[in-house]
Amino acid sequence: MKSRPLPYPDLILYNGKIRTFASENSTCEALACSGSRIVATGTSDEVRRFAGPDTQAIDLKGRVAIPGLTDTHVHLSEKGTAEMELVDCRDFYVDSHSVADILQRLATAASSAPKGSWIIAHGSPMQDFRLTDKRFPDKHDLDRAIPDNPVSISFGAHITVGNSLALAAAKINRDTADPAGGHIKHDPQTGEPTGELHERAQLILKKVAPEFNYLQLKDGIVFALNQCLQRGVTTVHDIVRYAEPVRAYQEILKEGRMHARVSILPRVIESMIESKSLIELGLITGFGNEWLRVGGVKMSIDGGITGRNACFYDPYEDDEHNHGIIRIQQDELNHTVQKCHDAGLRCCVHAIGDRAFDMALDAYENAVAHSPRKDHRHRIEHMGNWLSTPERMQRMVRGGIIAIPNIAIGYYVGDAILDCVGEKRLTKAFPFRTLLKNGVIIAGGSDSPGYWPVDPLRDIAACVSRKMRWGEVWVPEERISVSEAFAMHTTTASWVGFEENDKGTLEPGKLADIAVLAEDPFAIDAERIKDLKVEMTLVGGEVKYQA
């Protein structure tokens, strides 16, 4: 038995199989919590002896408890409000499998909206690949179905389509030039904009389209955090692009409505938050408390694969003239990374194409060469999804750079990515076995906005089985073990968050963040892990969710 000398515990979990993750196959039957932390682990008889008259005791009845799960890459502050407030045209959730289906949902929403008011909607990433029409709706489709309201519909984070009223409000016409790091699609015959906007071009429209109000934002965050608890997630690393979510999180915490922990990653390029302001304020990674803290800063090099805007050396398979979009030049990237690195802010750089991978590695190597610091824990978001060459892996290991791959992208839209990127570049898609063998540190992030749920159990199942939602067992030789997959969301994820002394294992002294599962994920078929029922989630020794 392991314990710390303290008064009667507040809570005891007993008669279970508690996988502590402190070492390979480490288990116990019971644990005790005082305040927010674990104070003892052992057999049920040993731990129950500590109970006092007011100790709450929960009989696990043989169920399995694991450390609370962490998702290291989400857009959570936007996710909940989007699900609650936007017109839902996502084919993963509703019956929107053709352009006509999407138009019907938009027209229904417009029928009950005042004339001239905005209709804001969201679809799914790469939905054009799955629609029967094999294309997104354009402004002409939207104009016919919704003639009296400006319409904006996003398909993932990298493409937005507007109708003529929306484009007019944003002053986008045939003469509007592409913004840096963005693209306005034009009809090759007429020169008129089609309504499809990529990357930074979306911002032109979003500046005139109404945002959520502040109360909606707060309620959406609470909604999304509670969704996380239903899948055993107790910590998320949330990418925020403006100040209101940061303020909202603080107020939610003060109001007692924050039931999962958040490490915020403010965007410092293409956002209303600047690295200069964070640096001048003196904020460093780790500022905050056990519930809300600064986890680093986020910046993006290229566009998204789901918009065919990730930047590759070779062109896209289905568009020989398209190499993707660079959103920030190397000198600006180097300058920003250097300033943040020097100020004690960990950098999390979005890079999806191989050209962007190399730019990120160049920037990190430049920063560390000028200001050596071993424990920076800088990250490359989406590194490890594909094109992890031996040279890139060596640079990652040598520089102490963390990879944050997103197997959820492959799980949901891998077939569409194969179509546009080509099998040659994806022969080693999501090469987790190879990455681990070569010493690269990888942690799991869903990249969840409102397009698919935050669900590490789904991602763990995909890592182990390699079975994708679209039916294929994809690159089975890159399977990893159940232990390795869980580490991506527990022990390694906690280390990535600079929280390895507080989270990731169930040991005395650690936070009592615990997920209780109906079955043992180590004892069932790998594909079934995604369907495991989460019976209970505790955060800081308190039950925050119960099925």
Regions found by a protein language model. Name each.
Residues M1-Y8, A547:
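Basic/polar N-terminal segments that are highly enriched at the extreme N-terminus
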Residues V337-C348, R355-H378, H382, V397, ...:
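His/Asp/Glu-enriched, well-ordered alpha-helical/loop segment
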